[in-house]
């Protein structure tokens, strides 16, 4: 009799222990499932609701002025457009409200009032000294001038590409270019650049290092000069530092938030001759209208097609920066 009672009690205790183990196991499994579900839910919520901090940004190059991170909304609702035009345009139009009129026309194309900025420059040469492109999309209008064709080409090469630059101390050091993507960019009110290539003994090749007059002149009285010399050879450089700044730059690739629209001329400027320049005909365009109203009307009409061949950027160009990425 006592044996049966002891057996019953033992079975009862074992059942309680087993049930307790099962309950704890089920609890642990449920906790794991619940925590995993919550973790996945939070992660998905963050990905679908948070701002885009670079996942879909098409350009990895950067500049020294940061804009807000882009979102997944329509570009025309959150983007800014800068239109750079010569003084000649506003002089010819001669209407104090022409910008307001164009803003209303851009509104019909999906660009809200206040998202389009009109920026005037006096001449291509002056614009070359300090180009500053601050908007998400930048359209630079250049009136074709046969006498300024080379200046226009150099400016287009500068603003249609990204450049990583360092300052140069030409009084202390010799410099050499490491490859085709390496150029020297000079900017200022007057840049005359002379170079003297050196041999391995630092003696001048065809020039005297102590006689500046014997140096080869590669730019004269320019406001913007992109200098290319023979790679792998040290050069002694001479220029007037009071009126010109020289930088050692490397071309990184196309700056896809900038487009150049050439006004007039028989052909679109070709900057693809440089082997480091990717074909950029899509962002080099030409319109042949004699009147500036007609030019701006055409731009308004095709603005959305134009920006489709461009890419929005998170940073801007500011050539005034000392250590900068332009």
Swiss-Prot record:
Miscellaneous comment text of the record: Some rotavirus strains are neuraminidase-sensitive and require sialic acid to attach to the cell surface. Some rotavirus strains are integrin-dependent. Some rotavirus strains depend on ganglioside for their entry into the host cell. Hsp70 also seems to be involved in the entry of some strains.
Posttranslational modification: N-glycosylated. The N-terminus is blocked possibly by pyroglutamic acid.
Pfam family for this entry, one: VP7
Residues involved in Ca(2+) 2 binding: 177, 228-229, 231, 301
Top-rank lineage group of the source organism: Viruses
Purpose of the protein: Calcium-binding protein that interacts with rotavirus cell receptors once the initial attachment by VP4 has been achieved. Rotavirus attachment and entry into the host cell probably involves multiple sequential contacts between the outer capsid proteins VP4 and VP7, and the cell receptors. Following entry into the host cell, low intracellular or intravesicular Ca(2+) concentration probably causes the calcium-stabilized VP7 trimers to dissociate from the virion. This step is probably necessary for the membrane-disrupting entry step and the release of VP4, which is locked onto the virion by VP7.
Protein name (record): Outer capsid glycoprotein VP7
Subcellular location: Virion; Host endoplasmic reticulum lumen
Keywords for this protein: Calcium, Capsid protein, Disulfide bond, Glycoprotein, Host endoplasmic reticulum, Host-virus interaction, Metal-binding, Outer capsid protein, Signal, T=13 icosahedral capsid protein, Virion
Subunit description: Homotrimer; disulfide-linked. 2 Ca(2+) ions bound at each subunit interface in the trimer hold the trimer together. Interacts with the intermediate capsid protein VP6. Interacts with the outer capsid protein VP5*.
Sugar-modified residues: 69, 238
Region (CNP motif): 165-167
Leader sequence segment: 1-50
Region (GPR motif): 253-255
Disulfide cross-links: 82-135, 165-249, 191-244, 196-207
HAMAP family: Rota_VP7, Rota_VP7_A
Family statement drawn from the similarity comment of this UniProt entry: Belongs to the rotavirus VP7 family.
Residues engaged in binding Ca(2+) 1: 95, 206, 214, 216
Molecular function terms, GO-annotated: metal ion binding
GO cellular component, one term: viral outer capsid
